[in-house]
Amino acid sequence: MSLDTTEKQQLINANQTHGTDTGSVEVQVAMLSERITKLSSHLQENKHDFSSRQGLLKMIGRRKRLLSYVRGKSEQRYNGLITKLGIRG
């Protein structure tokens, strides 16, 4: 499940670190989280869509690696990001 242009722009505006930021880790994690949410709801309805399940697992792994990178750089940025996105308990 992909994001359309308006959804992407809203995510970028909400998570960018400066005015022209479109690829920072925060933006990437926010986009991945939104795609993961959409794909999870799709898979609840379509339980036998195994190729989408594989893609979901890859996205979760990528998000996990990006979050690990942020955590290593700055614990404060990491905590702010997971709180803002509501992805960890």
UniProtKB/Swiss-Prot annotation:
Top-level taxonomic group: Bacteria
Region of interest: Disordered: 1-23
GO MF annotations in UniProt: rRNA binding; structural constituent of ribosome
Keywords recorded for this protein, A-Z: Ribonucleoprotein, Ribosomal protein, RNA-binding, rRNA-binding
GO term, biological process aspect, one: translation
GO cellular component: cytosolic small ribosomal subunit
Pfam hit, one: Ribosomal_S15
Biased composition (Polar residues): 8-23
Subunit structure: Part of the 30S ribosomal subunit. Forms a bridge to the 50S subunit in the 70S ribosome, contacting the 23S rRNA.
Family: Belongs to the universal ribosomal protein uS15 family.
HAMAP family on file: Ribosomal_uS15_B
Functional description taken from the UniProt entry: One of the primary rRNA binding proteins, it binds directly to 16S rRNA where it helps nucleate assembly of the platform of the 30S subunit by binding and bridging several RNA helices of the 16S rRNA.
Protein name in UniProt: Small ribosomal subunit protein uS15
Organism annotation: Prochlorococcus marinus (strain MIT 9313)
Gene name linked to the record: rpsO
